Regions:
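Sec-dependent bacterial lipoprotein signal peptides
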Residues: 1-17
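Short, low-complexity N-terminal intrinsically disordered segments enriched in polar/charged residues
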Residues: 19-62, 66, 70
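Short beta-strand edge/turn micro-motifs at domain boundaries
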Residues: 23-27, 142-167
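A solvent-exposed, acidic/Ser-Thr-rich amphipathic alpha-helical stretch
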Residues: 34, 65-114
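A mature extracytoplasmic/lumenal domain signature
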Residues: 72, 82, 129-131, 147, ...
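Acidic pyrophosphate-coordinating catalytic loop
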Residues: 115-120
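A short hydrophobic beta-strand element
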Residues: 121-131
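Short, cysteine-centered beta-strand-loop-beta hairpins and adjacent loop/turn segments enriched
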Residues: 132-142
Length: 167
């Protein structure tokens, strides 16, 4: 074999080996200390749902509550940072209008947003965001929020929210 043939054989072998189907990753069996009461196995989910959550937030900031409400299912439930729960789209819409009409949200940022799907098929968007809430008298308070949005048939059926003041 001459050098040219060896080089062609080497290149062909490299391409063939790199195109070979990789075996599936074997996930280790983990013995958790605490057993999850809901789910403990997720995979990355539908990123279109992240966009829906972002569009809903954009609508709230722009005070376009009708658009914000278009992302909510009729049976939506809001679990708020103060521990209260609001049930039903009409009640959640009323809450959004009352809570956000009297304030401005400034310097809004998203730190983390990702879609996950549980091994039971439940679809979620997890969002870590922050911003400043400015009241009518000009008082500004900054917050970090952590929210989870559960989706069913492309609509939000549950939102769970936590917040803390940002330094």
């Amino acid at each position: 074999m001459n050098l040219k043939q060896i080089l062609v054989l080497f290149l062909f072998s490299s391409v063939f080996i790199s195109c070979e189907k990789k075996s599936e990753e074997v996930k280790p069996n983990v013995n958790y200390i605490y057993e999850a009461t809901y789910l403990d196995t997720f995979k990355m989910g539908n990123s279109d749902l992240v966009l829906k959550v972002q569009q809903m937030h954009e609508s709230i900031i722009k005070k376009d509550y009708e658009s914000a409400g278009s992302y909510l299912a009729d049976n939506v439930e809001f679990r708020l940072e103060d521990g209260s729960t609001i049930e039903g789209k009409d009640n959640c819409m009323k809450f959004m209008v009352e809570a956000y009409s009297a304030v401005e949200i400034e310097d809004y940022n998203v730190a983390v947003n990702l879609a996950v799907t549980g091994d039971n098929g439940d679809e979620w968007v997890l969002l870590w965001d922050n911003g400043s809430v400015v009241t009518e008298d000009g008082t500004s308070s900054s917050f970090n929020w952590m929210e989870s949005f559960q989706f069913e048939n492309g609509k939000i059926i549950m939102m769970n929210q936590f917040s803390k003041p940002r330094n």
